[in-house]
Amino acid sequence: ILLMYLAGQNSGNALLDMEIAELMASVEDPAIFVFDYVPNAYDYLIREKGEQFFRIVRDAHPDVPILFLEDPYFAHYEWDSHAKTEVDKKNAAQRELFEKLKKQGEKRIYFLKSDDMVGHDAEAFVENIHFTDLGMMRYADWITPYLKKYMKR
């Protein structure tokens, strides 16, 4: 079982709710967890709740790989510096959480930068933020090799 905690297709959700972590922890025999909550989480939420969210999942599944993702960069960041700054802050918080966990000795955690997640044109997005079908296809093509590489099977 592959379990992803997605933000992008459930706009406004994925705010590191502990109930979601508990639900993820209850899954029997997962192959991998993908933490893809950054698009809707705020940097302060990642800093305040990220480790606790991780611990709930990790305590239930100590050997299952966990993949941390960044928020993708959108084409409009070329002219919207405020939006780019906000994403930079969220991605930095996600990276800091990952590095903290690594320093604590956590194994089987992985971090993926979003540089080439869905391409660099505006064709992957509707209204500059939600994935189109093409964006979802690019996302799937981008993440699949990593899933195959890191899954526990």
Where in this protein do the model-derived segments appear?
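Serine-esterase "nucleophile elbow" of acetyl-processing enzymes
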Residues: 1-9, 20-27
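Short acidic loop-to-helix transition motifs that present clustered carboxylates
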Residues: 10-15
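Alpha-helical cap/lid subdomain in secreted, periplasmic
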Residues: 16-153
